[in-house]
Amino acid sequence: MVEVLRSSTFLLLRNWEFTLAWIVFFTIPLVITPLPYVGFLAFFFILLFFNSTTQYFVKVLSKNEKSLEIKEIFKIKKPVFSFSLGESVYLFFTALLYYLFTKFYAVLFFWWWFYKPFLEKELYYARTFEDGFKALLILLLRPNWKYIKLGLRWSFIGLVLLTIAVLLVLSIAGVLLASFVVLLLSVVLAHFTAETILRIKTLA
């Protein structure tokens, strides 16, 4: 476990963008306001819920189960936890940096539309805490561009759902229901992400 964290840290620090984001995150916000840390925690828990839901739907769809046990979603497995932790750190820091360069939306578009379903595919095989980190790193180091076409259907549906969610959040009712909308959106997107994963032939 220590070796995985050490190698992962050295890998990320060699990326100047990540290093700069790390410096910005731990200096400026600490002096001005702790809100970015609160945002990071919220980001982590949203990803944790999403990843757990996705993995559950993959299991249900692959086994053609007729009934759903929603409580299983909240039984967070070790690889899902470590995967979500690594993902939230990497994505939050990267998004923070790109936000400074007005590229925030481009980062989210690339990550959620094309990368996310296939990182989830790798997570499907994970069984230990250490495997969760490996699942995150494998496609960051070796992206497979042929999978992009498989994510187009998921991307279109996700775009529609996100648009609806934004409109709700911008409305008066949306402000009151923002948390509910985020959870509902996570469940729906997780279902379609699971369908995308099952379309990938390498998932036996």
Curated annotation (Swiss-Prot):
Localization terms from the record: Cell membrane
Membrane topology according to the record: Multi-pass membrane protein
Superkingdom of origin: Bacteria
The keyword Cell membrane appears for this protein: yes
Keywords associated with the record: Cell membrane, Membrane, Transmembrane, Transmembrane helix
Transmembrane stretches, start-end: 21-50, 92-114, 150-172, 176-198
Disulfide partners: none
Signal sequence region: none
One Gene Ontology cellular component annotation held by this UniProt entry: plasma membrane
Keyword check for Transmembrane: yes
UniProt name for this protein: Uncharacterized protein aq_577
Organism taxonomic ancestry: Bacteria, Pseudomonadati, Aquificota, Aquificia, Aquificales
